[in-house]
């Protein structure tokens, strides 16, 4: 079998030195043209396939940076490796180490290569341009796409120092028209009014109860924020002023209603770790221990605590199809999964009944659940597996083409029934391919 190697060659460097288009094996030329040195934004590379005597094939790729964000060595190697893969696979037939989800044909979820190994926390797209989106995560990760999530480029926030940004874990991004908001830890909030071209930092009061946990863009200058203490605020002037929507924190509510008999309420540690907002502005949240859950409906002065319906603690909870009128889903320790009937009373302190189903996860915990539509439901299961239901959550089966992705999958998010993403650890991003379902 003929030995084949791949060479990475900077095309601009070749042109600057008067070289011909033939690539030199295993050599990378880093010099750039005068125009490129002036702009500092683009480098065009040619990836060649050579057996040491002649070039068999080549392709080209452009490595580009924007907003003053320099291309890191890792990002550069990522681009070049993808180009090499494009050259090598059709010609050599060689086995290439690549993510399983990307190499299996016909998979409903395929892995999108990313220039990062950070944990991915959130993703959102602009309603004005559905192909334009942002992805955030740990170690200051900020990525932008303009092709619907097929490719992603690193970005940076102007109001956050480069060294400082690496210490942040950006946990939430939300778009509404050109309005965009991002929050993270240590407590930070950023806002854009032009679809993400420019960002400004919103100052947070040191008296803010808790840390920002969720922000939702609602329109021009308008957004809602929930903190880890359960405080809910709304701004209508771009974050200059915030109006409280609840009269007290969750801790104060539980102290006042301790006689309500909510199991586990006395063990509340003072903060919630997960909160979701539906399309009508209703919220649902769970505390760190998962021993009860809480709901809030617009116009209420307080959160309403609810006892869990089983002895096992709640792992995750949310609204069915992001709509409280359609019911609530919950996952419990050990792979339990349950759904309520539609139109449950979120203001009642009576125990809400969940109909439990057999998720067939073998005891592995379910980390998130998302509805593609009213029939097709997906679940992210511990160990990097995806499970699916085609009957509204009644019966489940494992998706074998994604079960060995090699990283935990934490969040599933759909943007309509035909586009969805799964976010995980180690920079794992899966994109939904409805044509394979």
UniProtKB/Swiss-Prot annotation:
Keywords: Chloroplast, Membrane, Photosynthesis, Photosystem II, Plastid, Thylakoid, Transit peptide
Chief location of this protein within or outside the cell: plastid
Keyword field contains GTP-binding: no
Keyword Membrane: yes
First and last residue of the signal peptide: none
Subcellular location: Plastid, Chloroplast thylakoid membrane
Record GO biological process: photosynthesis
Entry membrane topology: Peripheral membrane protein
GO (cellular component) term, any one: chloroplast thylakoid membrane
Function recorded in the entry: Essential for photosystem II (PSII) biogenesis; required for assembly of an early intermediate in PSII assembly that includes D2 (psbD) and cytochrome b559.
Record-stated family: Belongs to the Ycf48 family.
Free-text comment on this protein's domains from its UniProt entry: A 7-bladed beta-propeller torus, about 54 by 55 Angstroms, with a depth of about 25 Angstroms and a central pore.
Name by which UniProt lists this protein: Photosystem II stability/assembly factor HCF136, chloroplastic
Gene that produces this protein: HCF136
């Amino acid at each position: 079998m003929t030995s084949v190697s791949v060479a990475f060659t900077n095309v601009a460097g070749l042109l600057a030195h008067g070289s011909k288009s033939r690539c030199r094996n295993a050599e990378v030329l880093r010099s750039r043209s005068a125009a490129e040195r002036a702009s500092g934004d683009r480098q065009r590379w040619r990836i060649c396939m050579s057996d040491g005597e002649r070039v068999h094939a080549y392709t080209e790729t452009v490595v580009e940076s924007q907003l003053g964000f320099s291309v890191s060595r890792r990002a550069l190697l990522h681009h070049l490796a993808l180009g090499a893969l494009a050259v090598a696979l059709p010609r050599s037939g060689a086995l290439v180490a690549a993510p399983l989800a990307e190499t299996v044909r016909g998979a409903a979820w395929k892995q999108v290569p990313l220039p990062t190994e950070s944990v991915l926390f959130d993703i959102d797209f602009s309603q004005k341009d559905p192909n334009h989106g942002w992805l955030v995560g740990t170690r200051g990760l900020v990525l932008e796409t303009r092709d619907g999530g097929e490719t992603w480029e690193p970005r940076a926030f102007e109001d956050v120092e480069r060294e400082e940004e690496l210490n942040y874990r950006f946990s939430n991004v939300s778009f509404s028209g050109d309005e965009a908001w991002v929050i993270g830890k240590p407590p930070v909030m950023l806002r854009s009014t032009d679809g993400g071209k420019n960002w400004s930092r919103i100052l947070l009061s040191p008296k803010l109860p808790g840390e920002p946990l969720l922000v939702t863009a609602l329109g021009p200058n308008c957004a809602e924020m929930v903190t880890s203490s359960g405080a809910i605020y709304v701004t209508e002037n771009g974050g200059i002023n915030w109006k409280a929507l609840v009269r007290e924190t969750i801790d104060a509510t539980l102290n006042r209603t301790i006689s309500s008999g909510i199991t586990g309420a006395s063990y509340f540690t003072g903060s919630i770790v997960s909160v979701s907002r539906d399309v009508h502005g209703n919220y649902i949240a769970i505390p760190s221990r998962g021993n009860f859950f809480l709901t809030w409906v617009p116009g209420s002065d307080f959160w309403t605590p609810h006892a869990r319906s089983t002895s096992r603690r709640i792992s995750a909870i949310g609204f069915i199809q992001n709509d409280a009128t359609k019911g609530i889903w919950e996952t419990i320790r050990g792979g339990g999964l349950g759904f309520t009937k539609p139109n449950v009373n979120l203001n009642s302190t009576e125990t809400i009944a969940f109909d439990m189903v057999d998720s067939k996860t073998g005891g592995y915990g379910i980390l998130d659940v998302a509805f593609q539509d009213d029939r097709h439901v997906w679940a992210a299961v511990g160990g990097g597996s995806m499970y699916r239901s085609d009957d509204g959550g009644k019966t489940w089966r494992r998706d074998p083409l994604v079960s060995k992705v090699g990283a935990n999958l934490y969040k599933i998010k759909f943007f309509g029934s035909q586009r969805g993403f799964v976010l995980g650890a180690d920079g794992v991003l899966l994109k939904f391919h409805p044509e394979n379902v």
